[in-house]
Regions:
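Hydrophobic h-region of N-terminal signal peptides that target proteins for export
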Residues: 5-16
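C-terminal/peripheral segments of proteins
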Residues: 17-480, 500-673
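Large, well-folded core regions of big proteins
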Residues: 480-489, 493-496
Length: 673
């Protein structure tokens, strides 16, 4: 490849073509150097295709709703959902309306993908879709859609209507003010929790080209990171936010629906979904009916229910992402967010100027007084029609709180810090902007508030330790219960003397897990219930000791059972921490596990953890849970799982430090765009 690229360079550079360098470090992470942002995007497209071409092409098919024509009938319903929301149509219609700079970046990115496909036709699957730059717009819409769709689904559920399930999304994010850190600069933790497989499997990348200088995680098939940092600031997001979407109860009769005093015709369209059957592609027609509120998604008791999403005709997400990627200060970041293109999220921004900032972001409709958007609203009366979109200034937000820290692990703004000034009463006129209560924090958030509130002179190493902490919330309450019920039990003393960390090498942590599961429903509780008897505790201890010594042996530890490794691989490694719902155990480090043989192997949770010290320039550390490449022979298929993630470590990014990067370069490619 290098020889081909150099030949191209010698032939073409005289005509003003741009040279792009792709330097890969010892973990296969691409560091792309170009003269322009478009050149960097070209390199990004090439590198992503080199590592995960098939997954990228699947992402485009998912967004368009054309999976079934390539992979069969099991994807028909998924395709229907994407057709329902018109991702392809909106993207095709409005691509021309994007900022020319964004169009140039999209086109350069796909040119890079096409270049790789041209040079490596043996890697191009027969089902590969034709590449078009508008697919990046469709993919952006597809990626954010689960959040507003989930809000509307919640409205339907509260009316007793079971909507189609929407995937769970969770995350951690933290910010420390300069006065709490050893470097006297803010520290950010960017820690999304999603599936380790599929469209949310992030791609790690560093990009340098023109005004684009960024490190972070991007969705495969998009040109630059959405989570990470540039030279001036960091950006993190977690699930949670204002109520952005609604359901309406509609009166429908004979292909018409009532609105005020008239019966309007339903908007009816037919989507033709290709379905692979053997060697053929057959077509299934699906009928989609909509009112002016949105598509009809459910029926019950003679009523139809439409879903109204304010992002339905939006297409400028990439523009907002670009504005964040190139922002130079907090004011620039706020202007980018004010475009209201991002889904409902808790967004945190830290800057090299020393700012820490939070906004409960989203595109939020203005609802009339007296209407309850938490349930389906009447569609026929006209009394609950949207009255525009709330401006960015209306959203819940705070800059530089006196506490000197913030965290949001999918919690209410009230639970982000001790004595939080962000209380729901301040938004009582429009409670859907706050969209939460003074509810107590979940275990992850409660632990992090305690840790951050006590933090002083925090180093990068200490912040990495916090991000990967395996401390089990309220384990001390169970230890006290064990002491009370079985003060003479030697095995009970092992658990009672445990340091309450689910470290991979801890036998007591594994024993605690088995003890909690032996308690049945009581063990799934975070705190010991009053109804738990001493006899039940002693019985669970006896069962646990027998299981631990009999089924697992004297050397078994937490990491004997809880492992990390890639699906389809032949090896796994012990890992610390995780969210063990069946035992009521949670740690700041989030990992969810599935049984694989006799092991519990991670499948979701921390997907691209970043620790960013906002010095000038920033210093950062990052890890993904598996590996950068989908090519098993590359050496980067599961190397981060083995060498970093299983050891609760993150590697330096060498951001804006090419001299140091050069010491770690393992491959070097030159391309021409």
């Amino acid at each position: 490849m290098k020889r081909i690229a150099l030949i191209l360079a010698s032939c073409c550079l005289a005509w003003g073509a741009e040279k792009i360098e792709i330097l890969r470090d010892e973990y296969g992470v691409p560091h792309i150097f170009a003269t322009t942002a478009a050149g960097a995007a070209f390199g990004s497209g090439y590198a992503q295709a080199e590592d995960r071409l098939e997954e990228m092409l699947r992402n485009y098919r998912k967004a368009e709703g054309t999976m079934a024509e390539a992979f069969g009938k099991e994807f028909v319903f998924d395709d229907y959902r994407q057709r329902l929301w018109r991702h392809r149509q909106v993207a095709q219609q409005h691509y021309k309306d994007l900022d020319p700079k964004i169009r140039a970046i999209c086109e350069a990115f796909q040119a890079g993908v096409k270049k790789f496909m041209q040079l490596h036709p043996e890697q191009v699957p027969a089902w590969a879709p034709k590449l078009e730059p508008w697919q990046l717009v469709a993919l952006g819409r597809y990626i954010i859609w689960g959040w507003p769709e989930g809000e509307a689904a919640g409205d339907l559920q509260r009316a007793g209507i079971r909507p189609d399930p929407v995937a769970y999304h969770g995350s951690n994010e933290m910010l420390l003010a300069p006065w709490r850190t050893a470097m006297h600069a803010p520290i950010a933790v960017v820690d999304p929790h999603l599936s380790w497989y599929g469209e949310f499997r992030f791609y790690e990348i560093r990009l340098y080209g023109g005004e684009l200088e960024m490190s972070g995680a991007t969705i495969l098939g998009l040109p630059f990171p959405s989570l990470g940092h540039n030279r001036y600031l960091s950006i993190a997001m977690t699930t949670g936010g204002p109520d952005t979407s609604d359901a309406y109860e509609e009166e429908v009769r004979d292909a018409r629906y009532r609105f005020k005093d008239e019966w309007r015709p339903l908007d009816v369209r037919t989507e033709h979904i290709g379905v692979k059957v053997g060697d053929e592609v057959k077509v299934e027609d699906v009928r989609i009916e909509s009112t002016h509120h949105g598509p009809i998604a459910a029926h019950k008791d003679g009523k139809a229910y439409s879903v109204a999403i304010p992002y339905a005709n939006e297409y400028r997400l990439l523009e907002s992402g670009w504005q964040i990627a190139t922002a130079k200060n907090l004011a620039d970041a706020k202007r980018a967010l004010a475009g209201l293109q991002y889904m409902g999220q808790n967004i945190m921004v830290g800057t090299v100027d020393g700012d820490i900032y939070y906004v409960r972001n989203g595109r939020v409709p203005v609802r009339p007084k007296g209407c309850d958007p938490s349930r389906p609203m009447p569609g026929a009366t006209g009394e609950c029609e949207w009255q525009g979109i709330h401006p960015f200034e209306d959203l819940v937000q705070i800059t530089n709180p006196p506490q000197g820290y913030m965290q949001n692990c999918n919690v209410s703004p009230f639970a982000m810090m001790k004595d939080s000034p962000l209380v729901p009463e301040r938004w009582a006129d429009h409670p859907y902007l706050y969209n939460d209560t003074r509810r107590p924090p979940n275990q992850r958030a409660a632990m992090l508030v305690d840790l951050l509130d006590a933090a002083r002179n925090v180093s990068a190493e200490q912040m990495i330790g916090i991000a990967f902490s395996p401390q089990v919330w309220h384990a001390e309450l169970w230890q006290e219960r064990i002491r009370k019920a079985a003060p003479q039990s030697e095995f009970g003393k092992l658990l009672a003397g445990w340091n309450r960390r689910s470290d991979a090498d801890s036998r007591a942590a594994l024993g605690f897990y088995f003890f909690k599961t032996a308690l049945g429903a009581f063990g799934r509780m975070v705190d010991p219930p009053e109804a738990l008897t001493d006899d039940a505790v002693r019985d669970a201890l006896a069962k646990t000791e027998q299981k631990l010594n009999g089924d697992f042996g004297p050397d078994a530890v937490f990491g004997t059972l809880f492992r990390v490794g890639r699906r389809g691989g032949s090896r796994t490694w012990p890992v610390s921490g995780g969210s063990l719902v069946d035992a009521g155990m949670a740690t700041p480090r989030a990992i969810s596990f599935d049984p694989v043989g006799k092991e519990m192997v991670g499948r979701s949770g921390q997907t691209s953890t970043q620790i960013v010290i906002l010095t000038r320039p920033p210093q950062s550390y990052m890890v993904i849970p598996l590996g950068e490449s989908d090519h098993q022979e590359s050496g980067h298929w599961d190397d981060q799982a083995q060498k970093l993630f299983s050891k609760s470590q993150a590697k330096p990014t060498y951001f804006l430090n090419r001299k140091e990067l050069e010491k770690h370069v393992t491959t070097r490619e030159e391309l021409v765009y």
